Amino acid sequence: MPKIPQMKYTVYLFDFDYTLADSSRGIVTCFRSVLERHGYTGITDDMIKRTIGKTLEESFSILTGITDADQLESFRQEYSKEADIYMNANTILFPDTLPTLTHLKKQGIRIGIISTKYRFRILSFLRNHMPDDWFDIIIGGED
C-alpha cells in the first residue's frame, strides 16, 4: 500500500460557533426574543439552531418566510441589541478548545477564526477566556 505523505500545516482557520464555542443558548435566546416580539411563536429551538452559521438575515428569512430586505435588516438590528445583553453570558468554549489551540500555538502554528458571527462579539467573548494576541486573525460577519 502506498504511503500517504503527512502534511504539516502552518495555519489553521476555525469557525467560531459549533467549532470553538457553543453559543446556541445565546443565539436561541436572542432569536426567540425578536421572533416572539413580532408574533412568531411556533418556531422551535431546533429550527433556530439549524440556521446557525447563516447570516442573521438569511436565518430570519428561513424562520419567518420574510424576504423584504428592510424588514430583515430591522430584525438583524433588534437581534444585535439582544445579543449585547445575552450572547457572551450564554456562550461557552468546548472542553477541547483551549487544549487544542494551546497545542497548536506551542508548535508555532498560526491560528485564526472566520465566522458569520460579528468580529467585535467574538473579541468581546475571547477577552474573558484567552490572551488578546492568541489569534493571528479574526474575520467576522461585518468584514
Q: Where are the regions a protein language model picked out?
A:
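N-terminal helical cap/lid subdomain that shapes the substrate entry/recognition surface
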Residues: 7-99, 103, 107, 120
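Substrate-recognition "cap/lid" segment bordering the active-site pocket of phosphatases
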Residues: 118-143
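Residues at the starts of beta-strands that form the adenosine-phosphate
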Residues: 110
